[in-house]
């Protein structure tokens, strides 16, 4: 027998068991991360870069500091900030909110990641909407906005936020047919 001492033998079994359990945990965690961050939509893959880090929290709070908890003001202030960032096609995967701000450009997925990250840290229910060759954000606002159209999902009112149109306002008109919506994430 390789190990004569019973105590050492049991300790080695325990260490082996803990190691194997840890490896299995890492593998399962990795699958979960990939499943939630890389989403296949037809023949393309969307990379979720939504972040709720300190940078995004400070940015969202700074942009909404003059809104006195007015939800429409908060959403529009964040949307205004994002739409002022120049649109430029990014051939690589979607970038984080901080990267978009620091590099001062982004395409639809970059700018939508920035916008939805800020909305999430401020507590808004918001989702990505994927349509052919484009992505935009929808946000739930309890307040009904007069003379503006909303999308209703599970009886909740959502307004379209278009991050790539300079000066875009809440409730941007839907430029796609409903059957062109590939996913709401």
Predicted segment positions?
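A structural boundary/capping signal
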Residues: 1-185
């Amino acid at each position: 027998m390789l190990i004569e001492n019973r105590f050492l033998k049991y300790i080695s079994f325990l260490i082996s068991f803990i190691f194997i359990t840890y490896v299995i945990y890492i593998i399962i965690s990795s699958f979960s991360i990939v499943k939630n961050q890389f989403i296949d939509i037809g023949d393309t893959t969307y990379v979720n870069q939504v972040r709720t880090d300190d940078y995004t929290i400070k940015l969202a709070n700074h942009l909404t500091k003059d809104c006195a908890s007015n939800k429409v003001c908060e959403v529009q202030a964040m949307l205004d900030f994002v739409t002022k960032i120049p649109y430029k096609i990014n051939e690589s995967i979607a970038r984080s909110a901080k990267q978009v701000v620091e590099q001062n450009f982004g395409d639809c997925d970059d700018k939508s990641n920035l916008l939805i990250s800020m909305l999430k840290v401020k507590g808004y229910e918001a989702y990505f909407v994927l349509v052919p060759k484009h992505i935009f954000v929808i946000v739930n606002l309890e307040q009904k906005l007069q003379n503006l159209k909303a999308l209703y999902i599970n009886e909740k009112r959502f307004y379209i936020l278009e991050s790539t149109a300079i000066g875009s306002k809440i409730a941007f008109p839907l430029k796609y047919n409903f059957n062109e919506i590939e996913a709401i994430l």
